[in-house]
């Protein structure tokens, strides 16, 4: 039935709807605790969206960059460790000096982070806030608050917030997780964070749906860059996931 291929007024068999289907954006907004207009729904891999975000910062700069990162004399990146090797490989491939941040039972050593971000060459930090690889550490609320209220010297400092396990709870009842976007906005850092998630740990690894969430100002900026790269992602897969998952529950 052709009607099964329509989401609102969008025909999923056609081009268009760069930032994703309205229903898919609403689903991820519910999952992440943010607003649908802050969500960009892409293809099957959140890692690809992460790579693309760093790549665009490198070639074009971010919203508040004074120049593209490729024109900076030296760039550094904070890497809570032990952590996810594929994260580190992304920033390493762009020539960043990787700085190890020791992990504690409550997340990265924030005393060290707060000192290091005073260096304008430090452009960002990787984060897996829940069940961080490989130790399964969950960031405490205090750690997340301290991250959200950071005052980096670099105007384009970027939190890469990989919320891969955002709806998982391995022990006990589900505990709502702090929304990093609203926390950053609360502390005057609305444009400092890009949050990533996918259904890879929910439906099918390699055949799910991925997204990023960011401020509306960042979204407007990024859409202009992404529009050069792709007309639209796989909306049929997006709709398939919405119809099967239905909601966060």
Over which residues does each language-model region extend?
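N-terminal basic, amphipathic alpha-helical segments
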Residues: 1-3, 227
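Conserved core of the PLP fold type I
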Residues: 4, 9-155, 166-187
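Conserved core segment of the aminotransferase class I/II
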Residues: 42, 182-249
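Hydrophobic "anchor" residues on beta-strands that sit immediately upstream
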Residues: 124, 158-159, 194
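Walker B catalytic acidic pair
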Residues: 162-163
């Amino acid at each position: 039935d052709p009607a099964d291929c329509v989401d609102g007024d969008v025909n999923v068999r056609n081009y268009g709807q760069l930032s994703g289907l309205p229903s898919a954006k609403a689903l991820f907004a519910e999952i992440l605790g943010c607003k649908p207009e802050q969500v960009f729904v892409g293809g099957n891999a959140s890692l690809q969206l992460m790579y693309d975000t760093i790549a665009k910062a490198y070639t074009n700069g971010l919203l508040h960059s004074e120049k593209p990162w490729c024109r900076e004399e030296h760039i550094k990146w904070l890497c809570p460790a032990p952590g996810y090797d594929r994260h580190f490989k992304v920033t390493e491939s762009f020539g960043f000096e990787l700085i190890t941040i020791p992990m504690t039972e409550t997340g990265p050593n924030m005393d060290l982070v707060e000192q290091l971000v005073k260096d304008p060459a430090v452009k960002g930090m990787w984060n897996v806030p829940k069940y961080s690889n490989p130790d399964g550490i969950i960031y405490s609320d205090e750690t997340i608050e301290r991250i959200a209220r950071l005052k980096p010297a670099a105007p384009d400092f970027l939190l890469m917030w990989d919320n891969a396990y955002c709806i998982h709870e391995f022990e006990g009842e589900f505990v709502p997780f702090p929304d990093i976007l609203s926390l950053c906005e609360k502390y005057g850092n609305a444009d400092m964070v890009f949050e990533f998630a996918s259904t890879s740990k929910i439906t099918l690894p390699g055949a799910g749906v991925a997204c990023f969430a960011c401020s509306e100002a960042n979204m407007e900026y990024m859409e202009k860059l992404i529009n050069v790269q792709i007309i639209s992602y796989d909306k049929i897969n997006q709709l398939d996931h919405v119809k099967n998952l239905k909601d966060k529950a």
